[in-house]
A protein has these predicted regions:
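Extended catalytic cores of very large enzyme megasubunits
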Residues: 1-144
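A short, hydrophobic C-terminal helix/tail in secreted or cell-surface proteins
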Residues: 145-149
Length: 149
């Protein structure tokens, strides 16, 4: 089944309706959170579509456990950001088949032991690059790095 592709203007207008005329919210949602493929094709027309994507994916995982919430129950919690407000990376990443995204926003990284060698510093840099390319933020725990005097 081929997914519907929306133009920027279609997604913006529908998001503007959803956000009751808030132009900034509508533009930010389309630019940052609407599902897009690597060619920039937009696959969600409004935050309602996003909430259904998130609800369906969480319900899929929840179904493996007792007392699971249905997709509709989860959608009702997400709708208009009333009870559950996912942060940026989860809003983009949950149920998104078009890109690899982190489901967490921020990570603390570091190495075991002293981090005062070139190798340890490069390892931390590599971890930061991998996290940032997946839209995660990184905090380096570098208190073990010795200053040069």
């Amino acid at each position: 089944m081929e997914k519907q592709i929306y133009s920027y203007d279609e997604a913006y207008e529908e998001s503007l309706r959803y956000f009751q005329g808030d132009e900034l919210a509508a533009r930010v949602w389309v630019n940052k959170y609407a599902v897009k493929d690597s060619f920039g094709n937009i696959y969600e027309k409004s935050p309602e579509d996003m909430h259904w994507r998130i609800a369906n994916e969480v319900a899929r995982v929840e179904s493996k456990y007792p007392n699971a919430l249905t997709a509709k129950e989860l959608y009702d919690l997400l709708d208009h950001f009333k009870y559950i407000v996912p942060q940026g990376s989860p809003m983009t990443g949950i149920g998104n088949d078009y890109q690899v995204a982190s489901l967490s926003n921020c990570f603390v990284i570091g190495v075991d032991g002293a981090a005062d060698s070139y190798g340890a510093i490069i390892k931390i840099d590599e971890e930061q690059v991998q996290l940032m390319k997946r839209r995660g933020g990184a905090v380096s725990y570098t208190h073990l790095t010795l200053p040069t005097i």
